[in-house]
Amino acid sequence: MKKPVIVPFGTMRKGKVVKLNDQRLTCQPKKPYAEVLFFGDLHLGHPTCLLEKAKENLDYCLNNRIHVLLMGDLIECGITGSVGDSVYTQKLNPQEQLEDTVELLSPLAQAGLILGLHGGNHEDRVFKTTGINVAKMMAGTLGVPYLHQACWNIFRVGKQSYTVYSMHGASGSRFIYTKLKAATDISHYFRADVIAHAHVHDVAAHTIERQSINKRMKKIVYEKHYVVLTGHYLGYQLSYAQMKGMPPSHVGSPKLQFFSDRHDIHSST
């Protein structure tokens, strides 16, 4: 990947909106695969944000040359009129959240490891009330592709290419099986090697096996597809989830390995 140019925060630079995010990934040293961490729902500024755990994962990616796809809701962005009480309880105001998030992600962007940045419904709060797209501003400042709230991706690893449909999502599912069902339903309409779905604050990877016919070889073949829930970084105690009686969920981000010597994907959650 070409390394982006980081501009000082406050310098206006138009974020580049892409419809097809075509990226060449670098394999791990002496390994036949490239790795991608799907990182989202940080909610920086929220009183229960587990920022240190997020920093650990991002530092690990930086030190080990792991690519990162940003899945939205990176900032809490509590504003007047938004759902919930975070406009009163957030630890930083939205401007500080925006600046701290750019500072947090700049080393990865400078290293050319950020594949793209999605907006989420929390960033979208500002757009709905002012027309200012803070997610696009973050992408422009970092010099990475802005993927809106959903985007097709092609990840090229060696001679292999993988299709990934990534999105922030909008499901109100409460339990892991209903969260996975909501993401799996999307796979019925988007034929991709990976469906990556954020927003539901859980980490999971589900494999779908499908049959199809290879017309050239005249035989039945099996295809493996992944549905991935891309995690979060919010503690449970005194959280919205606890207040609503939702079960505690796994904190963190899933990591996928995309192989270069065969068409295969492994997951680590």
Where are these regions (language model features)?
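Beta-strand-turn-beta hairpins that frame and shape the catalytic cleft
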Residues: 26-36, 152-165, 222-225
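Core catalytic region of metal-dependent phosphoesterases/phosphodiesterases
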Residues: 29-147
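Conserved beta-sheet core of the metallophosphoesterase superfamily
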Residues: 70, 163-164, 170-266
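A generic local structural motif
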Residues: 23-25, 55-56, 103, 152, ...
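Charge-rich, low-complexity terminal tails
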Residues: 116-124, 129-132, 250-269
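Charged, low-complexity C-terminal accessory regions
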Residues: 114, 118, 124-206
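Acidic, histidine-bearing metal-coordination/catalytic regions of metal-dependent phosphoesterases
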Residues: 1-39, 47, 152
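Short, flexible loop/turn elements at secondary-structure junctions
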Residues: 40-46, 157, 168-171, 231
